[in-house]
A protein has these predicted regions:
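Active-site neighborhoods and metal-handling regions in enzymes and metal-associated proteins
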Residues: 1-260
Length: 260
């Protein structure tokens, strides 16, 4: 069921979204060569719990049937990992690209956002892929308006990405969000204009395209969480939580520092 947030609930979503963005700002200086992704998780967990007074939503989250609960507080997806990478003793190296995905719960409401980071100087391909994904996310967000449809968002993303000769992952998508981490509707990053659910003021959704440098096909690893590109090509993702307003949209997870 799609939930329409009251003005009071929207205010709580704004707070949760702002705090999630603060986590991504805080961790940025720590994303460097020689640092293990589990250390990034530890840093974020401590900040989320002790500094912000929030709950890290991914920790012990139960996803698909049969999969173990997610064991960490953030997702770290490096290079060809598309999404849901589990922080580990894997040490970052110069040239890596990494997506850090953070979801916090504050006063019962979720703020969900992710951002790409470069470890040292990126390759030309990595730089271009990351920028195209970022621009695609914003094209999708700018397609949000009351009376529009989710297909408008997906089409804006897909058409731009494919025009740039990259591919959009189809097996994973954005979602409604609020008191529940993953609510209806599904927010596909591909589609046709005018298709899908109508956008109504008070809806809160995530827009989080996953864009591959190679083919769009992905596979799920044996841990039940980590998703990688089948052809081992690089993948990038950006994410914001967005409120549908009477005038258009409001991004709830913008960095207080103006980034993202």
């Amino acid at each position: 069921m799609i939930t329409i947030k009251t003005p009071e609930e929207q205010d709580k979503m704004r707070v949760a979204g702002r705090l999630a963005a603060q986590v991504l700002d805080m961790v940025a200086p720590h994303v460097q060569a020689g640092v293990a992704t589990e250390e990034l998780d530890r840093i974020c967990h401590t900040y989320i719990v002790d500094e912000l007074g929030c709950i890290p939503a991914p920790l012990n989250y139960r996803g698909s049937a049969g999969a173990a609960p997610f064991p960490k507080s953030i997702c770290t997806s490096v290079n060809h990992v598309v999404c849901h990478g589990i922080p580990s003793d894997r040490v970052l190296r110069n040239g890596d690209i990494v997506n850090i995905d953070v979801t916090v719960i504050k006063d019962g409401y979720h703020g969900d956002t992710s951002r790409m980071y470069f470890v040292g100087p990126p390759s030309i391909q990595a730089q271009r892929l990351t920028k195209v994904c970022f621009d695609a996310m914003w094209r999708g967000i700018r397609a949000i308006r009351p009376g529009g449809h989710l297909g408008d968002v997906g089409h804006a993303i897909q058409s731009y990405v494919e025009e740039q000769r990259f591919s959009v992952v189809r097996e994973y998508c954005g979602h409604g969000i609020g008191r529940v981490f993953h609510e209806d509707p599904q927010v596909l990053h591909y589609g046709r204009p005018g298709a899908g659910n109508e956008l109504v003021p008070g809806m809160t959704i995530t827009v989080e395209p996953m864009v591959n440098a190679g083919k769009r096909e992905v596979k799920l690893l044996a841990d039940g969480w980590t998703v990688v590109t089948k052809d081992h090509s690089l993948s990038a993702q950006w994410e914001h939580t967005v409120l549908v307003t009477n005038e258009g949209f409001e991004v709830l997870t913008m960095s207080p520092n103006g980034g993202g």
